[in-house]
Structures are given as C-alpha cells and as structure tokens.
Swiss-Prot record:
One GO term (biological process): mitochondrial DNA replication
Compositional bias segments (type: Basic residues): 472-481
Ranges annotated as biased composition (Basic and acidic residues): 494-512
Biological role stated in the UniProt entry: Involved in the replication of mitochondrial DNA. Associates with mitochondrial DNA.
Catalytic reactions on record: DNA(n) + a 2'-deoxyribonucleoside 5'-triphosphate = DNA(n+1) + diphosphate
Alphabetical list of SUPFAM superfamilies matching this protein: DNA/RNA polymerases (SSF56672), Ribonuclease H-like (SSF53098)
Name listed for the protein in its UniProt record: DNA polymerase subunit gamma-1
MF-aspect GO terms: 3'-5' exonuclease activity; chromatin binding; DNA binding; DNA-directed DNA polymerase activity
Amino acid sequence: MNRLLQKGTSLVPSWRTRGCRYRRCSYAPQLHAKPLEMETSQRRMNPLNIQMLSKGFHEQIFRGKQVQHAEEDVQRSITHLKNHELWGQETSTVPDVELQLPKMYGNNIEEHFQILAQKQSLPYLEAANDLLNCQLPAMPQTWAWQSGWTRYTATGEKELVDFPDEKAMVFDVEVCVTEGCCPTLAVAASPQNWYSWCSRRLIEGRYTWSKELLLSDLFPLETSMNCNYMTKNNWTERLVVGHNVSFDRAHIKEQYLIKGSKTRFMDTMSMHMAISGLTGFQRTLWMASKYGKKKGLQEVKQHIKKTRSNFSGSPISSWDWVNISSINNLADVHALYVGGPPLEKEARELFVKGSMSDIRTEFQELMRYCALDVQATHEVFQEQFPLFMERCPHPVTLSGMLEMGVSYLPVNQNWERYLDEAQTSYEELQKEMKKSLMKLANDACQLLTKDAYKEDPWLWDLEWDIQESKQKKTKISKKQKKANEAAESVGNKLVEDHNEDPGPPTEKEESRPSMGKLYLEDLKLKTLPLLPKRNQHLPGHPGWYRKLCPKLEDPDWLPGPGLISLQMRLTPKLMRLTWDGYPLHYSEKHGWGYLVPGRKNNKLNNEEEEEIIPCPYRAIEDIYAEYSKNKTKDGCLSQHSTIPEEFMLTDDNSMWQKVEELSRTEMDLSSEVPATAKAKKRNNSSEHPVKLEMEFDSLPDNHHGNSPCGDVNVSGCWFYKLPHKDGNANNVGSPFAKDFLPKMEDGTLQASTGDSSATRALEINKMISFWRNAHKRISSQMVVWMKKNELHRTITRDPEFDEENKYGAILAQVVSAGTITRRAVEPTWLTASNARADRVGSELKAMVQVPPGYHLIGADVDSQELWIAAILGEAHFAGIHGCTAFGWMTLQGKKSSGTDLHSKTASTVGISREHAKVFNYGRIYGAGQPFAERLLMQFNHRLTQEQAAEKAKQMYAVTKGIRRYILSKEGEWLVEELGISVERGEENSVNLQDLRKIQKDATKRSRRKWNLVSRRIWTGGTESQMFNKLETIAMSPSPKTPVLGCRISRALEPTAVKGEFITSRVNWVVQSSAVDYLHLMLVAMKWLFEAYDIDGRFCISIHDEVRYLVHSKDRYRAALALQITNLLTRCMFASRLGIQDVPQSVAFFSAVDIDKCLRKEVTMDCSTPSNPNGMEKRYGIPQGEALDIYQILKVTKGVL
C-alpha cells in the first residue's frame, strides 16, 4: 500500500521547511483595552444600504484598507435584488460598537491568525516531528507484573517510575469491560523507551472494589500518584498520539483536574477521516466491496430500488476511491497506510468478554497485543502526518483540532440524582402503560360475547378461536357407583339438614370434621381423576388473549395479560389507533397501514382467487364519519405536522446525516445530455413491471396517500400503507417508532374516541421514548469523583462549597474529526436534544453543572452555515455584502415583515416556517429536488405525489433557480456551423430545450459522441450565485475550503469518484468551512485567555455553539473575549474571500450566555416528567444571564 502514499511521503522534507515558520513570537498584545471616544460620524453603510463595521473597528482590523465597489457590480446587485422584490425594503441599523481591540500580530487579520496558530501549535509540532522521524526501540519480550508504571530502557532494564516523563509518546489503553470503566492496563512508547502500566485491580485481585471511579483508579501521565495539583507554570507541553485517542484520554488522571494540563492529543482516526474518510453511504459500499465489486453493485442497486425506484442509469461507475480509503478501525487504517500482514485483533475479545481472572492468566500475551497496537499506531502516524499537513496546511486547523480534543464536563451529586429519578420515572410510567394495555386486553376479551368482535373495525381478524375445557372419560365400576350414590345421599342429607334448625352441636360433633369439609374432600377426589395430566392454559379464552398471559409454571407468573407490550403486533389494534380517522391494519406483505372503506371490487384478477375476509367496513365508515364530525367541530387539523426531532437544527448536528440518507443517490450527470422523451417513456414503462388490475373508479375521492395495495384483500376496503420516512418501497414495522411521534402530537395518529387507557398509553410511549433510547448511553457515562484534597482551592475556598456534596467530571469522548467534513462526533453529548416537557430524562444537558466559584459562558453562532454559504455566493457574484437575494435575506431579512430566508421560502411554497428552515438547510447541504419531494410528503402526508412534486419544483425554481448550460468550444462550433438559433442567457448560457436541439442536429450530422457542455450553472433564483460557487468548488480538480484551504477526503476527490457523490461534495464545502470557523474561534479564544490571564478552559462545542468553563470572577471578561473572537473570525472569513469588510449585524453574537449549567437558553427551567419542579426548585440553579455586546461593554467598561 505504500505506493498509494508516494506523493504524500515525498512531501516530508518540504513540511519540515514549513515547520520552521512556526516560530515562537515574543510579540505580545496590550493587556488592557480602552474604550474609544465617540466620533461624530462612525456609521458606515455599503452601496446596498447595509450597515457595516464602524470606522474605528474597520481601521483596527482591516488596517485602513479602502473598500471600493465597481459601479457595474453595484447596479447588477440592485437589479438582482429588484427581481426578487427585496430592493427598497426597509433595512435595520444598530448603534455602533466602539472598543479598542487587543493589538494583533502581523500586518493584517490573515497574518494575525497565521502567526497566532503557529505560536500555539509549535511545541506540539516539534513533539510530532520527534515521533515522525524516530524508530521505536525494540519491544520488551516480557512485561513487568507490578502496579503502576514500568519503564523499559533500550538496554533492557526495567524500573518503576511515577509516570512517563516524555515530550511525545504513542499510547493505548485497555479496559476489562465486564469489570466496569476502570483502566486495566496500558502501553506507551516514546522515541527512547517503552512503558507499561497495570492497575491495582489487576495486580491485587481483591474480591470487591468500589463501583465509583476515583482519581486513584486512573493512571497518571504527568504527576505522581499522590500529587493532584500543579501551578500553571509547572505544566509542560506534551503530545500523546493514539487511535481514537479520546477513549484513552478518559482514563488519564490529570485530565480530570479542573485547571487542565498542557498535554494535547493527536488522533490518527481523526486524521484518517480528514485524509481518506468515507461518507456513510461510501462505508456501506466499501464493506460490500470486500466481498467483490459485483456484490457491491448489487447492494447499490438494491438501495436505489428502495429509495428511488425511478432512477435510471449506471449507479456507480467509478470504484477507484475504494483503493485509497478505508473504514475507521485501526486494522483497516493500518492496512491502507502501511500495508503488510494484517494486525492480530483476536485478543481484543478477551477484554470485551473475559474476566479479570482471564486477563491475569493471559497477561503476557495481552500486553504484547496492546504493545503491537501502539507500534501499529506509530507506523500509521508516520505515514499520515505528512499527508495531513499537506492536505490541511493552515496552522489554525491543527491548533483547533488539538483544542477540540480536551473537552471537559463538570458534574456534581445531581448527576446521580438525575439518573435515579429518570429511571424511576421511566419504570413508573412503564408500569402505568402496562396497566393501561392490560385493561384494554381484558376489555377486548369481552367482545367474545355474542361474537361482538365481528363488528369491531380493529379486532375482527384476530385469533378468536376458543380452547374448550377437556376432561378424562372414566369407566365407573359397581363399587364406585354405590359410593357415588352414598355420597349423593350425604349431599341430599346436608341439604335437608340445612333447611332444619340443627340446634347447638354436641361435644362429640364438634370434635368430628364438618360435613362440608368432608363433602369438599370427596368432590376433590372425584374431580382430580377427570383432569388431564397437562393443565390447560386458560380454556374458554380466545387465542390472542392466551398468548398474552403467562402460564402457571412460569416462575414470574401473575394473573392477567402481563406479557403485553408495545412491540406486539396486536397492541395498535387493542389501542384502536387511527390514521386520519381510519383504523390501522397489518399486512404480512406490506407492514402497517390503514383501511379506507369504499372498495367495490376486492377480488384480484387471478385465476385462483382467495377467500375475502369479512371486514366490518360499515363500522369503519361510522368511525370515519365520527372523526370528520369532531374534526369539523374542533377546526381543521393542521396541514403541517410538528417537526421531527432529527430535523431540530438547533439541537444537534444530525441534519446532514438525515439529508445524506434521503438524497445519497443523487449524482452528477453534467457530462450527459438529459434523457430524451423516448428514453423517459421507456424508463417510465418499466417503473412498475407488474401492476394489479384494480377498479380505480372506486378509489375514495376524499383521501390522499400512498397508492392503495390492491393485493391486500379486505372486503369493502382499500389498504393504504403508512408513509415510511425512507420512501414508499419500505414497510412500517411499528406505528410506535420514533418517526411517528410528530404524527401523534399533531393528531394524525391517535387512539379512537372512547376508552382513555389507549390515549394514555400513547402519551406515555411518547414520554418515555427519549430515555428508552438513550438511557444505556447516559448511564454508562464515565464519571470520576474527586475528594476534597483533589479539588482546586478555587473550589474549596468558595463560600458555596459544601463538603457533603460530590464533585466530579465527565470527559466526553469526542472524536475531533469524526466525519469527512471534519465535524466532531460523540454519541451522547453532541446529539442530545434540549429539555422537553413531555420527555423523561431530556434534561440531560442541564446536568452538566459547574462547581462552586465557576460559570459556563458560551454562545451559538447565529445562522452559521447560512452566512458562510451566503458570503461565498456574494464573493462570487459582486463582492458586496448583501448583493445576492440569499445574502440580503440572511443579513437584513426580518421575520416580522416576512423578508427573512425562512419566511420567504414558507410563503413561496405554502409551508410552515419551521419546515421551510429544514428545506433551506437541506439545499445548502446539497440535497436536490427529489429530497424536497420526499420531505414534503413526510411533513404533510396528505399531499399527493403530484402535489409534492409541483411544490418542490416551485421551491427550487424560486430558490436554486433554473439549470442552464454553457457550451463547450465544440458546442459553440456546432451552433455556428449548423446555423442553430439559440436563446442566450446569463454568461452566454443556453436552456435545456436548445441543448437538446443542438444534440439532435449534431447527431444527424455524425453518430459520434459530441461533448457539448463546458459547465452547468443555475440562474434566476435567490440562491443561484451561491450554488454556482459551491458547485464550482465541489467539482474543481482539488476541492478545498476557501478560508483555511483544507482539502476534501481523497475518497471524494473528482479523480477518484468522477461525477458521483455530488451531494456529499457540495455539503462538504459548507460544513467543512463551518469547521474552519470553529477552529478559528478556538484559536482566538485560547489567545485571549492566555494574553489577559482569564481563568478558564474549553468545555465543549456542540454543532454551532461553544462553551467555556470560567472562574466566576472572570466571567464577564470571558464573555467579552468571546464577542471579540466572533468579530475576528467573521473578519478572517471575509478577508480570505476578498471582501475587506463585515456587516455590523453579524459581527457579534446576539447574546453570550453566562450560566451555572449547560442548557440551550439561560431562561429554560428544563421541566420534564423526571424533573417536574424545574432546575431552580429541584436543583437550586437559578436562571442565568444572556448579555449582548452593549450590556457586556457596560459591565466590563470595555476592558478585558
């Protein structure tokens, strides 16, 4: 595999040359900022009447560069805005902000960030260079069986040490999973020595250990075991390299100290994602290719059949990318970059499934396995790092990734309280739901009387057969007959005696057994022989009910239908669920759907007709009539459902993954002329090879949905499938799935009127959905608790410190570049939704609570991706802020007047503003019109396919515009040579009709393949200029981010994928630029914290928000530093795109949050079913502060 990397490894010498430019800089900024005196005329407006930075700011940041715009560019911008009815709209202004900024490095904003990042990353680059150029010493043959660290010198000596005192090392940790989270053993290697570490739990072998993790359970990397505090100046810069190194970091003692060390972590898995990472779809194809390309193609075709049945053409034409990429595990990454024999990974299973005793038995072999992983990681690093530096050359990228790798989440005793109360609430609601379901089952069982079930729209097709009670037939002998007659006479005597007054019993009678007891004993003796040897299970009850009840021999037996659950197929029927008023029904072939009455002929036109199931369709008509009556009375139902959780853009960064799922097969056909009408007709004719002959005249007029399934033979009714999020070709396995929660909330999916038990069960299912899905991940979070002497004195000396409370931390295991866009990835914290009043445990993020004497400060970057996409389009179009309709709406649009981006899209298509927001982000992420069609039908299932297609077409025509074609030299020659008349548009382009005409005439001239198109452009839309720029970057020979120059993964470069994966490439431009934005912010904040001695550290970044943990005395200065950081980052973006200015409206955060816990808004009380009293009453955490730039300047007097 080394041949794949010849180009990369040849760059090592040139990287070293560049490395010398990462010089230490003694040039320090001023430590105090002073407010400027107000000038009489500071406000600056650009030619489009948009307020820009004040004169003072512009002079400080852009160093007096004159902003000039060509009159032609201004007029073109005005004309464009007029075409979209935006020119002349009211623009807003705000008071200018006056502040003396810290003195910056270099001659301009770009040099400032360059020098700043070089200064921050230089020590780590030097350490990386040591690892890059070294050969590890020989691996020890035997490993020391002793707790703590052991050093193995080059001479073969072993010595016990406090910690590996090394500047750079490669590292790997192993954990015995069955014993908990405590590290079991570790191996490290430096250019000089090998090291091993063994835990006391492994060596001492006690019977029990504390379940709570303490600092003493972790291994030290920078201090002795008994040292828990070092002054700021005593920490030294160290570099630790590992594969998925965030897992290893979580087991290091010093990383839990609140002040934080200067050790940074370099992840070979993250570097691999940046160099040769794969999209989700590519990972599937890569795995398929392991079994041969034919199988890979087959899987692609199957995927396309499921997602886009009308797709035509060869799906994947290039497989070159498979050979220059791999999935993320160390074995495959090593095979890609290093090659050679495959890594041995069998021993890993012993750590996953084995016990501590097993590990002791195989100690030497397992230590060798861990050491081989360290060696493999070092080999990967040596091949990777030059490639990484070549493909991500800006020092800000490296510095930002190093900072991302030291996340820190403080927690206290409320974390355990949260876990207990969420689990208790979940279990109580589960019991209540089961009780409701059992009641429904018991009530339904009563329908057996007089065959009432036959008229029930839901239960008519259940298993209603009854098991009769059985008894043995026995021959009665003469002796038995006499005994029976005697017993009968005794019984008669008892009856006679019962009718007479017997008087008081005698003493002899009292001592004898009573006649009643004797009678019962006799009855038992006669009954037992009649019972079968094997007890019957609930005779006299219907079959479906018997399956819900545990048998008597079951050790957990309880009376009643205790086995019922939401996962059972009959539960939706027992709950009498309806979809738009129609009862749900299950088909073995098509999954869950619903029955719509009105079918007149429900016989298939096959020779062998199946027997029609007697369905009570009249009862269904009555139910729908009642539903319609109630709907009219309550007002029409909303045509737009509530937004699904995965599209909550402010909650997490999963929007792109969703877009990729829905549009992953969209490919670039730029080299092809669009299909002719004849070809389209041929494709359409084969779209449905087998069609059932159905009587379409009988289809209901008042119902729209997926086409009915004519092969579901239910008398008098059509069967419609429930809409699936991934398209009509997929079946719905359960109507209780997460995707249907919005439909429950808007009333589309509901329990029929009547018994409240079903409605309550539905409500509970929604309430417990979050905790049911997430509780394992949340409960398994690795929390390390600290004793008082392990806490920093800033905590213990604070008046709010309480020795009875617990203080600890969670190190979120964030992969700093977990996707091809270099976005960070982590399964719990980076995907956690905000607290919701109807979701148990959804107050998760608010459980990150600061210790006494500290605050969290942070902010969301306002419309981050929208602004990035907008400024790319503006720089491409006229170089003026607000010169495109998309840019103008992003900067100046107002929700109140309907001129903001989301309101404009909503009014154009007739959808809600929240839904419009999803479509807008989806387009920016590269999703095409088919994505919009499917999403429209998902948001509003009442739309027909035709209506959705029309709305999507209208939306894309207004926003993205119309596709036009710029002819190649060959195409222009044909137009002139053949005298073809064409209509010219923007950039001398032609439309689709003219292109087809040229193709037709050219084919008549010669049968050779003509290359007519040079490139394609979008015209006429509000976003056309932006998309032209995005596609220009995405389809360039070497796509790279415009600001920091990071290149796209080799697995997506055009040379490897040809014209495919366009959605992923367009999305990469915006998302990867957003990562550049984050890295710039992290670098700037680190600079300001160090320069102005602000006591704080990076906490976490969740999508477009950042949070810092800051000592309370510095919280307002930190808030000001965050505002300055945003200003400088925006200016860096504009400068790199050739625009020497920034609009005032985006220069600062709308608000910086100062809070005691992690939550979306400082005013959120985070009331949930598991936290009904909210944060203030239950946990004593009041509302925080949200301060804009003017309020921060007032508090700080403009001084950092």
